[in-house]
Amino acid sequence: MFFTKVLNNQVANGLKQLPVHKRVQMAYDLHIPNKTVNPNLNIRSHEPIVFVHGIFGSKKNYRHDCQKIANVTHTPVYTIDLRNHGQSMHALPFDYETLAQDVTDFCEDHGLKKVNLIGYSLGAKICMLTMLQNPDLVRSGVIIDNSPIEQPHIEIFLTQFIKSMLHVLNSTKIRADDKDWKSKANQAMRRYIPNGGIRDYLLANLINKVPKGYKSPVINYDDGYIHFQNPVRHMTEVAVKNVSAWPTEHVKGLKFEGQVRFLKGTKSAFIDEKGLEAIKEYFPNYSLSELNATHFILNERPQEYVKLICDFIKVNRYKSLQEHIRHVENFSSAELEARHNAEHERQMEELRQLTQTTPTAEQVKTIDNLASKVDLSATERQQQQNKEITV
């Protein structure tokens, strides 16, 4: 097993072993639609958005973009920290099967259904694998500049990322109390990464104090030096070989029939002809938009990619509503009324019972869920009467 070899190499290099956990608790932020956008907005959503970052990224990288997406689409957006990133646990394995299962576990733990997945780079592959292996969990996907194939040609770039970060940690020995710690780290990384935008992306993980919340068991935050939030010394192999991989054998014959929008940088090689053929095979209902950018689309074309995502989510929601109404219209008026009346009354009676006394935290969740169902029931009846949709 590859990660067993990784653990042995960590010991050989004098490093404390990275723990092995099948499941991890992932840190996340929830971006709620701003009430000023629509004061009457009911934020309960059966189709929330989950945003998955790239290698050495975190949930904080695109928090402003995700808030815009939440506001424009009137949809809650969950941004997560993958294992070994941000404020989430540091642990092996670090492969696509494990990372996709982490996303699935997160959705199930938080009661998220029919999610819209948005993934960038590493996160894009994780989202694609999640869609293929758990299609009932996902409504749609936005895949930002990646394709479902092995990509050995990107290993040279991943290696440079690792070298630059290790150079900051091992060679420069920058003190945490140095007032110029970040600029010195930036200068040190130039040796391996001339692109200032990429350096800024990696430096967003650099800290000069003990982090709040999760504290890695393999990083000594009290040694007086700066540190990356990622366990960089422990990721020299997995961040290169595993990130460039794709579990072809595990997804053979699988397809995701939902709508998937791919965003491609015209100056990027992450979606080539081979990648496009694989996209067609796995995702028959895909569409492709190109932006004048390198692989770092989110930094170079922030307004364009946010608009493309919002338009896609809104159009897809309209199609979802159309499907729902076509389903409802298959019932006769009498059948529909009987169905609604019985279910509506049962839900209302349960709500009455729960709200007679001060509810517990668990009962609050039940009340919220029931209220959402009652709202939907009323909406269905109105739709049957009006025979029209307002989006």
From Swiss-Prot:
Compartments where located: Mitochondrion
Keywords: Coiled coil, Hydrolase, Mitochondrion, Transferase, Transit peptide
Domain AB hydrolase-1: 48-154
Transit peptide: 1-24
Main subcellular location of this protein, as a coarse class: mitochondrion
Catalytic machinery residues: S121 (charge relay system), D145 (charge relay system), H295 (charge relay system)
Known EC number: 2.3.1.268, 3.1.2.1, 3.1.1.-
Superkingdom classification of source: Eukaryota
Applications: In contrast to S.cerevisiae, W.anomalous is a better ethyl acetate producing yeast. Ethyl acetate is an important industrial compound, used as a chemical solvent applied in the synthesis of biodiesels, paints, adhesives, herbicides and resins. It is also popular because it is relatively non-toxic and fully biodegradable. However, the sustainability of the ethyl acetate industry is severely hampered by the current energy intensive production processes that are based exclusively on petrochemical resources.
GO cellular component: mitochondrion
Catalysed conversion reaction: ethanol + acetyl-CoA = ethyl acetate + CoA; acetyl-CoA + H2O = acetate + CoA + H(+); ethyl acetate + H2O = ethanol + acetate + H(+)
Pfam families per record: Abhydrolase_1
PANTHER family recorded: PROTEIN ABHD11
Homology family: Belongs to the AB hydrolase superfamily.
Name this polypeptide is given: Ethanol acetyltransferase 1
Species lineage: Eukaryota, Fungi, Dikarya, Ascomycota, Saccharomycotina
Name of encoding gene: EAT1
